[in-house]
Amino acid sequence: MAIAEITEKLLAAKKAKGISFEDLEKIVGCDETWIASVIYRQASASTEEAEKIVTALGLPAELAEPLTVPPMKGSLEPVIPTDPLVYRFYEIMQVYGVPVKAVIHEKFGDGIMSAIDFSIEVDKVPDPKGDRVQVTMCGKFLPYKKW
């Protein structure tokens, strides 16, 4: 995955300060996954949010402005991810994508789930057989227009 220079700076500062995305959520007032998407340049922040991020990381104020610019979303390379965790999501969509699409169409009709009017949350669910990862996606349903 190609990582932008600013992302490298933000992540290095985050590591050096020992700050988690959850810590940044409390400081910025936005969900930790959304903050991670700003840092990885897949979302843009308001000026106030960007300033809170760079201040919390102890970085120069001029690094806030680039975080407010709408990024080129979905531009991570290569097309098929090689990172094992990211690949699992690719694999999940390969296996369950068409069945999930069929269920969505059955419940809502012909359309798509928005990735703009959208949220995603990651939670840890304790389990005696090994902790589980719970990912909840919530997107507005957008029916296809007929004309």
UniProtKB/Swiss-Prot annotation:
Active site: 88, 91, 114
Alphabetically ordered keywords of this record: Lyase
Enzyme class: lyase
Coiled coil: none
Gene3D superfamilies reported in the protein's UniProt record: Cyanate lyase, C-terminal domain (3.30.1160.10), lambda repressor-like DNA-binding domains (1.10.260.40)
InterPro entries for the chain: Cro/C1-type_HTH (IPR001387), Cyanase (IPR008076), Cyanate_lyase_C (IPR003712), Cyanate_lyase_C_sf (IPR036581), CYNS_N (IPR048564), Lambda_DNA-bd_dom_sf (IPR010982)
KW Lyase (keyword) present: yes
One GO-annotated biological process of the protein: cyanate metabolic process
Family listed: Belongs to the cyanase family.
UniProt function note: Catalyzes the reaction of cyanate with bicarbonate to produce ammonia and carbon dioxide.
Name of the featured protein: Cyanate hydratase
Species, as recorded: Acaryochloris marina (strain MBIC 11017)
